[in-house]
Structures are given as C-alpha cells and as structure tokens.
Amino acid sequence: MMHSVSRLARRFCATLATATAEISGEAAASVPTKAKKHRSIYKKLSSLGTRGGGKMEETLNQFVMEGVPVKKHDLIRYAKDLRKFRQPQRALEIFEWMERKEIAFTGSDHAIRLNLIAKSKGLEAAETYFNSLDDSIKNQSTYGSLLNCYCVEKEEVKAKAHFENMVDLNHVSNSLPFNNLMAMYMGLGQPEKVPALVVAMKEKSITPCDITYSMWIQSCGSLKDLDGVEKVLDEMKAEGEGIFSWNTFANLAAIYIKVGLYGKAEEALKSLENNMNPDVRDCYHFLINLYTGIANASEVYRVWDLLKKRYPNVNNSSYLTMLRALSKLDDIDGVKKVFAEWESTCWTYDMRMANVAISSYLKQNMYEEAEAVFNGAMKKCKGQFSKARQLLMMHLLKNDQADLALKHFEAAVLDQDKNWTWSSELISSFFLHFEEAKDVDGAEEFCKTLTKWSPLSSETYTLLMKTYLAAGKACPDMKKRLEEQGILVDEEQECLLSKICP
C-alpha cells in the first residue's frame, strides 16, 4: 500500500512538472481541446455532490493514475467554480487533497480555503484554521477572508474588532473590507451605518469602488432617502462615467420600483442594459426580475429572447428566473410554454422548475394541471418532492379536500425523505380542518403519522388540545402524554388542560 501511495505521489509531482509542456504535438488543436478537458474534469468533480457521485480523493487520484493533467492553478479554479455553484464541501476537499500532496499554498490560497471552511464547517472552524496559520502566511488576503466570514455571519462585535486589528496591521488599503462591513450592516437592517463607513474610507484616502457606491445607494434607498440617492449619483458623476456599473443601475431601479417611481426605474433599466456585459447571465436575470417588478411583460420577454440568443443552451438558473417572473406576472400560458420548453431540453431534472409550475397552476385554481406536473416529475427524477407536496396539500386544505391532502401527507412519510421538514403553516392548516370538523379521531391519526417522523412538538400538542376542546371531548391522558415527551406546559396549555383533562 505504501509503495502504491509513493508511486501516486511521484506521478502527481511529475504531472505538475510538465505544466509548461502541455500544448505540444498532437495537442496542436490545443485551446479547444484543453478547454474541453477542463470542462470534462470539472463536470466529473461537480457530479460528486450528487448521490452516488463518488469521492473527491478517489477521483483526483484516478485522474493522476490515468495521466490526466492535474495542476494546482486548475484545481484552485475548480474549487472556486464549485464554491460559486454552492458546493463548498467538495471545493474544500480539493484543498485537503492538495495539502495531502504537500502542495504549497500562498496567502491567497489560504484565504479561499478559510472561506470554504466557514461555508462548510462553520465560523468556529474557520477561526481555528486562521489561528493555526503561521504569522508569515497571514496577510491582507487571509485577514480579509476572516473578516468576510464574520460579516456574512453578521457577527458585528467580532467583525469590528477584527477590522480594527486589520487597520493596526496596515491590512486595510482598499475598499473591500469596508464593503464587507457595509454588507453586514445592510443584512442586520442597519443601513444608517453605511454612510459613516464611506466617510471613514475617505479619511484613509481610499477611493470608493462601484460596489461601495452601489451599497451606499442601497442604504439610502432603504432609508427612503431619495435626496441621498441623488447626492451619491452626483458624486459618482464627478468621479467619471467609469465608476458606474450595471449593478449600480440595478440598485437604482430596485429603489425606484420600491417607491413606485416606475418611469425612473425604466430609465435605470435602460442604463443597466447599456452598461452590462452581455456575456454575464446575471445581468439578464436582473433585468427580467426588475421588469417583472414593474409588471412590464413585453420587456421581460424581450430580455428573455436576448438571453436565449446569447446563450442558445439555456441553463436551469435562467429557466428558473424566467418561470418565476412569469408566475409573478400571472402569465399561466407563458409558464406552461416555458416549462414545456425546459422539460424538452433539460439535462438534469430540477424540481425547482416543477415547483414554480405547480405553484403557478394552483394560483389559477388549476389543480389537475398542477398534479399532472407533480406526477410527471416523480417519473423523471428522485426528488426532493417535499415542496411540491406541501403546495398541493395547502391548496387541497384551503378547498376543503382534506382527505386528498392526507393521502399526500402519508405518501410523503412513506417516501422516507429524511431531508423533509413540513412547515408550521401546513400543520396548522391540517389542525384547522380537524378543529372545524370537530374530528378528534382524524387529528389523532394525523398525529400518529407525524410521530413516524419525529416526536410531536409543544405547538402540535396545543393544536391537538384545541381540537378536543372544539369537539367537546375529554382527553384524560393528555397530561401524562405531555410529561412523557418532556414538554413544559405553558399558560395556554394549562388553560386547555383544565378543560379537556379535568
């Protein structure tokens, strides 16, 4: 075993050593071939996040044994892409594999890894990793990465202390740390603290970047300070047109939409389109969402057509954006058409698309069509179906079809989808039906189904007792049931118990 590991390590090192000799001989067809290989490798690595996809270490080792070029800068890129598409654990496994191969990390590499640790293992693990780094490795990138972690988790006290430490160490030389703090305060619902950070930036002779200006504008919008918005725009104009980005105009449009200034919103959206990079999908998504916000269906379709011309192979993210937009516009014919188009072209069946279609049909009281989408989805993918089932159940309960809703609930339990958690709204809706029908037996049967999943909560027992009270029936053993579950009886439950459990 030790010999095979040594051979693997030597082969990996040899692969790295040939980095500069990649494009030669039969690779003269080169760039397209190389790009195709990269796509193939990334596709394999990203599939590891799916059920039965395999393990990262085994896959990377196999690449090395097969002579597939596995270079550090490519691995870093794959890790960044996995992070972008919300697979931080898989991305972290790439770094862990590189560490086992004794590949040296720069400060920037450590910064990325720290971020991935926070995303996949939590903030405490990220702090431990940061503290384990040698002082010679800790630089502006690593300090900045930890600050970002604090800000994302809205740990204001830690973020402020860490930021002051960065200032003392001369690790604050650009707008990024300030932008992180601004984003944190916006997330904390404290937009009034953003302007002071802009002042602090300027006192340090740091020029605001386009992101800074965008968040400053956002903060003014949150405070409904339209004069403040105009002042920021005037300052940006003084800086020069180059400081304006599509994101600036997206924020402007969102602010104007929120206060009902649709004319100004339209102007901002036109500026967004003129300033955006046509190769960035998110720009089209923002346009679609914002035009939806002003109920401009014709512009939504126009941007959708632009996106499809730019990207003939439309991905799931774009289809999801369009379907959600059409659903908000109550364009059921559009939803039907786009959903059918997606189903006919998709590589992987994404239940989010089906959920939007189901929700759209139910809004129009078209239960049969919604159920047809659900049944079709069950044949085409392995789930998860919890969201779809809840949508159907809520609709059935609102339309006095509790028997059908219960069948869906029982089916969900039989599916044994361990990731499913029902909403409190759904449980309350079921019990509202039992209470109005004075159906104690039905409520108890429902509780039995619930306990197949997990013990009943205190809130569920309250709803059950209300059903007994509505039915005018006693439940002599209710106190004992609560005690056995270790539930601390609150004032409302004491009152209910006094009436149903004398």
Swiss-Prot record:
Task: Specify the superkingdom.
Answer: Eukaryota
Please list the residues that make up the transit peptide in this record. 1-13
Q: Name one GO molecular function term.
A: mRNA binding
The ranges of the PPR repeats are 139-173, 174-208, 209-243, 245-275, 280-310, 315-345, 350-381
Q: Tell me if DNA repair is a UniProt keyword of this record.
A: no
GO CC term (a single one) = mitochondrion
Report the main location listed first in the record. mitochondrion
Localisation per UniProt entry: Mitochondrion
Pfam families, per database record: PPR (PF01535)
- This protein's UniProt keywords: Mitochondrion, Repeat, Transit peptide
Looking up SUPFAM superfamilies in the UniProt record yields: TPR-like
Q: Does the keyword Mitochondrion apply?
A: yes
What does the similarity note say? Belongs to the PPR family. P subfamily.
User: What protein does this entry describe?
Assistant: Pentatricopeptide repeat-containing protein At4g01990, mitochondrial
Species in which this protein is naturally found? Arabidopsis thaliana
